[in-house]
A protein has these predicted regions:
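Short beta-strand-to-loop capping motifs
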Residues: 9-13, 115, 169-171
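A residue-level signal for beta-strand positions that form part of recognition/binding surfaces
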Residues: 2, 83, 164
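Intrinsic-disorder/low-complexity, polar/charged segments enriched in Ser/Thr/Lys/Arg/Asp/Glu/Gln
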Residues: 6, 108-110, 166
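Catalytic core of non-heme Fe(II) oxygenases with the double-stranded beta-helix
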Residues: 70-146
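Catalytic core of Fe(II)/2-oxoglutarate
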Residues: 122-197
Length: 197
C-alpha cells in the first residue's frame, strides 16, 4: 500500500490593494483574446499569460509585479516568479485528474488566488491506496491566497453557472532557476501517462 497526501493550503487573505489590481485586470480581460486555450468535450479553459518562456529573464507587467511582491511577503523573498497567468474554466467543465509535468512544477510552489464567484467549483486532491485514487474535495474562497501541491494528482470540476477564474503563479527558489525548467520531468510525465489510462 502506498499513500500520498497532496494538499491545498490556505496561506493568507489578499490585501485590498492587491485585490483591486487583480480585479481590474480581470475586468479588462477579453476572453476571446487568449494566449492559450484547451477545448475538448468536457474540458474547456482559457489562460491569459502574463509572462512565460525564458525563466532566467521574465518580463513582468508593473501591476502584476506588485502582486508577486506581495506573494513573496507570504512565502519568502528567496522565491522568484517564473510563470504567471489568469486561468478560466467555463461553467460545466472540468480538468480531469492529472499531474503537472514540467521540471518547474517539481521545484516550484504553485499559488492560486480565486477571482470569480464560482460557488460550485470544487478542487480534488487524491490519496493513492492500493493502486486506487481516493478523492478529497476542497473549496477555494474569494480573496484568499492558496498553495496547491500540483505534482501529485489533482482535478477541478466547475458545476456552477459561472466561469471560474484564478490568478496562478509559479514561484521557485531563485538559486534553483535553470534554463531547462520548461522541459518535461520524466517521472512526472510517466505518472501523467498512467493517470490517462
Amino acid at each position: 500500500m502506498s499513500i500520498c497526501v497532496p494538499a491545498i493550503k490556505d496561506l493568507a487573505t489578499v490585501p485590498n490593494d492587491i485585490w483591486q489590481i487583480l480585479q481590474h485586470d480581470l475586468d479588462n480581460w477579453d476572453h476571446q483574446n487568449v494566449q492559450y486555450s484547451y477545448d475538448q468535450a468536457f474540458i474547456r479553459h482559457k489562460a491569459k499569460l502574463y509572462f512565460t518562456g525564458d525563466p532566467l529573464n521574465p518580463s513582468i507587467p508593473d501591476d502584476i509585479s506588485n502582486v508577486i511582491d506581495w506573494c513573496k511577503t507570504v512565502i519568502g523573498n528567496e522565491y522568484t516568479a517564473i510563470r504567471c497567468f489568469l486561468n478560466l474554466i467555463e461553467s460545466g467543465h472540468e480538468f480531469p485528474i492529472h499531474v503537472d509535468t514540467l521540471k518547474l512544477h517539481c521545484l516550484s510552489r504553485r499559488l492560486h488566488i480565486p477571482l470569480s464567484n464560482a460557488e460550485e467549483c470544487f478542487y480534488y486532491t487524491y490519496d493513492k491506496i492500493d493502486e486506487q485514487y481516493i478523492p478529497h474535495e476542497h473549496k477555494m474562497k474569494l480573496g484568499t491566497l492558496y498553495e496547491l501541491d500540483n505534482i501529485n494528482p489533482h482535478s477541478v470540476i466547475n458545476r456552477g453557472k459561472n466561469s471560474r477564474v484564478n490568478f496562478i503563479v509559479d514561484m521557485i527558489p531563485t538559486n534553483q532557476i535553470t534554463a531547462n525548467l520548461l522541459m518535461p520531468d520524466i517521472e512526472q510525465r510517466n505518472l501523467f501517462n498512467k493517470l490517462r489510462k
